[in-house]
A protein has these predicted regions:
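Motif-centric detector for short Cys/His coordination patterns
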Residues: 1-91
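Active-site environment of non-heme Fe oxygenases that use a 2-His-1-carboxylate facial triad
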Residues: 55-57, 61-108, 113-287
Length: 288
């Protein structure tokens, strides 16, 4: 029922009725479960290992354990734990795995000893996969320009935020490559938004529920492209297991609140509290 090369299912499950059931079943000589179905004169064979792996009874009875290693401002004292040498990633599989584990479990990694030529980040990025193209083009320079079409292209300090919350599918990972840092300022800050969400979940469930259930509108109005982009999304979105999927937070690109009048007060206060915590030194780290 599957294409031998692509392994995509070739058979149309919609051709089967809702009332199909096994007519006969047994373990065959190869140790596979053999089922003769009540329709279509069809016999299926299942590996026991596949059945065990896809047993929804077992899976959904097991306690889910999040893979994420949430962190707070105390990470700043041990910031070298998220450092990794550029050459280690480029030259070894072990270095690549270490980098991927930092990104997956911690959500952040600082790569040092990187080359400073333009476009020199691509070899290390391509160790993971291809880069995702956006209308900003790839790569794009974050520099101070006259008449900027984005706050990133100004000399103003930026608040903690997630980029492109008005995308239907915001970036999973973003990579910032610092080529020059000789100007005044240039300090960086980072915050584990999942850790802040977890704090609210444990200490202010009403705020947490508001942030996970009531969508906010984000928008981008770019005068250079005659384009208005907008999307509704919750500040915190969850997976089917109740773990964290992503966070949308950006005071610069959040549009006017658009929700039921009865919800307006709690939405405003919940988002305000979330934003305050995302900038609290208890949760964020700073580095240069």
């Amino acid at each position: 029922a599957h294409d031998k090369d692509s392994r995509h299912r070739m058979f149309n499950i919609l051709d089967v009725s809702e009332n199909i059931n096994p007519k006969k079943y047994n373990l065959n000589s190869d140790g596979k479960l053999e089922i003769e179905w009540s329709e279509g004169n069809h016999v299926s064979h299942y590996d026991i290992s596949w059945l065990r792996e896809n047993c929804y009874t077992i899976k959904n009875n097991e306690e889910y354990k999040s893979p994420y290693q949430l962190w707070d401002g105390s990470l700043e004292k041990n910031i070298h734990s998220i450092y990794i040498d550029h050459n280690e990633i480029i030259s070894s599989e072990e270095g690549l795995v270490k980098w991927l584990e930092l990104l997956h479990y911690k959500g952040i990694a600082i790569v040092y000893n990187a080359p400073v030529e333009k476009n020199s980040a691509f070899p290390v990025l391509n160790r993971i996969s291809h880069t995702r193209e956006t209308f900003f083009k790839t790569p794009f320079e974050v520099i101070n320009i006259p008449k900027p079409n984005n706050s990133a292209y100004t000399a103003h300090a930026l608040q903690n935020h997630m980029d492109l919350p008005w995308f239907e599918n915001p970036p999973g990972y973003q990579f910032l490559h610092c080529l020059v840092n000789s100007a005044k300022g240039g300090d960086s800050s980072a915050v584990d938004a999942f850790a802040v969400a977890e704090y609210l979940k444990k200490n202010d469930k009403d705020t947490f529920d508001t942030l996970t259930k009531i969508p906010l509108k984000f928008r981008d109005k770019d005068y250079t492209q005659e384009a208005h982009r907008s999307f509704y999304g919750t500040a915190i979105s969850l997976t089917k297991d109740g773990d964290y999927n992503d966070v949308r937070f950006s005071t610069a690109t959040m549009d006017a609140l658009d929700c039921h009048p009865d919800q307006m007060d709690k939405v405003y206060k919940s988002h305000h509290k979330f934003g305050k915590l995302l900038h609290d030194d208890k949760f964020q780290i700073k580095f240069r």
